[in-house]
Amino acid sequence: MAEINQTKCDLAFQISYHPIYRLAQFWTLSVSLLAVPSLLYFLLKRVLLLPFHGNLKCLLITYFSSIFLYALVLCFDFSYQCLIPFIVTTKCSLIIDQTLYKCGHMTSLFFLTTPMLLPFGFSIERFVAVGMAYKYEKMRTLLGPILCFILVAPNFVVFYFLFRDEQFTDSFISFLVLPNTPAVQFNNYLWFLLYAKIGNFCCNCVLLIFHKRFKNTYLKKKTSLSVRYALEEISNSSKFTLILTFTHLVFFGAYTIGSILVRTLGESFFGNFLNFYVARGVNCAVPTYNLLIAFVGLISLRQLNSRRHAKILTKVLIRVTGQEGARNYDDIIMQQWNTVSNRTR
C-alpha cells in the first residue's frame, strides 16, 4: 500500500510541475479572477436594468448568476492548485484531501452544467412572448421563475444518481478531473446537453425567422404603438438570447468534444500516462467563456440598442423641410381643424 501511495505521489509531482499543465492552471486562474468582477458588473449594471419582460430577466439573472458562481468556485479551485506546489514539502501533499476534493469537484461540475440548461428556458419564454405579443407586456412575472426551477432542479437529480455510489477513494490533484466510476455517465450527460443545445440553437433561429414574419404581418395592420413597441422589444431580446446561446454552444462544444476526445484517444495516443493525465487536466474553454461572455453581452447590447435607436429615428422622425415637410405641416393643420370642427358640431 505504501508503495502504491508513493507511486501516486510521484505521479502527482510529475503532473503538477509539467509546464503545459502549469500553464493551463495559471491561465484558468487568471481568466477566472478577471471574470468575477466583469460578470458582477455586467449582472448589476446591465442585466438588472434591461427593459426586457420580467420572465426573461429572471432567466437571464439566474443564468449569469450561475456563471458568476462558477467563476468564483474556479477561483478557489485553481488558486489552491496553483499555490499548493509552491508551499508543499512532500510530494504526497500535492494530492487533494478527500473531503475538500469532494466538495470542490461536485460544486464545480454542478455550476458547469447549470448554465447549459437555462438557455432552454430562453427559447420557451421567447416562443410564449411571440405567441402572446399583443398582451405579453401586461403578463405577470411567473413563467420565468417556474422555468428556472424546472430547468435547475433536474440537475440535482442527475448529480445524485451520478455520484450516489462514488466513494472518492482515488487520488486527485485537480478538482475538475472525474473519478473513473461516474466518468462515462457524466460524459454521456455532456453529450446529451451538447445535442440539446444544438437543437435549442436551431429553435432560436426558427423563432427569429417566425417572429420577423409575424411582426411584418402585425405592422401591416392598424396596431397600437404599445404592440409595435412590444414586438420590437421581443425582437431585440430574442437576438440577445440567440447571441448568448450561440457563444455558449461554441465554448461548451469545444470543452465537451475536447474532453471526450482525450478519453477516446486514450493513453496510447499520448505516449504515456503522464501526458494523458496532463491532457485531461487542461480545461480552458469554459473558464475562458466565463470571462468573454460579459464582454460579448456588453457589445451585443450596445449594438442592439444603437440599431433600435437608429430605426426609431428613421420611422418616427417627421421631416419639416422640403416638399415632404410641407405635406407633413398641412396634414397636422388639417388634423387640428378636423378635431376643432368635430367638437363644435
Swiss-Prot record:
GO terms for molecular function: G protein-coupled receptor activity. The keyword Membrane applies. This is Serpentine receptor class beta-5. The chain crosses the membrane at residues 23-43, 58-78, 104-124, 143-163, 190-210, 242-262, 281-301. Residues 1-22, 79-103, 164-189, 263-280 are extracellular. Glycans are attached at residue 5. Belongs to the nematode receptor-like protein srb family. It is a multi-pass membrane protein.
